[in-house]
Amino acid sequence: MEVYNDYNSNLTNLFFCVKERPLALITELGFLPLNSRDDFDAIYRQLKCEEFDDEYLAIELELADKYFSPLHAKAIKALLLKRAQRGNVRRAANYYKLIRYSFSGAGKSFGGKPCNIRNFFADIWRCSRRLENVVIENKDFESLLAQYDRPDAFFYCDPPYYNAECYEVEFTARS
């Protein structure tokens, strides 16, 4: 079993969309122009606000109530909400562009070398095939280790660099 885990939800959402929705991600990337610092700043602000809508979510939630018993509908709706949060293609496309067009791929400031986003479509497709049997998680390391620890498990944990400025999530000396 292979598991990819990161505490950064934007990164795990991107990997989830590459794995589960590569064609939708490629399509969305084609519709999101990024040609200037202003475009970069707009995407950066949008990602900070975390305001992304799944246009079909409301319909799917209604259908769950209509076609399933209340107990089953509740479970299905919880799964739909979790999937919508993890599988947000627009958010993934924005994050991908942010890291591709930023200085050192950090996603903080505009300054990457010019490139055509369409050149990355084949990479996304290949990555999707590679991730086919990989479980993608967004957990802290303790929860992940507790869930997947087995006698034959191998873990590589890239530790956070304490007091570094390059992380989207906060780390303390104990985490």
Residue positions per predicted region:
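Class I S-adenosyl-L-methionine-dependent methyltransferase module
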Residues: 2-135
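Residue-level preference for short coil/turn positions at secondary-structure junctions
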Residues: 132, 150-151
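Conserved SAM/SAH-binding loop
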Residues: 139-143
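Short conserved loop adjoining the S-adenosyl-L-methionine
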Residues: 144-149
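Conserved acidic-Pro-Pro-aromatic motif
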Residues: 151-175
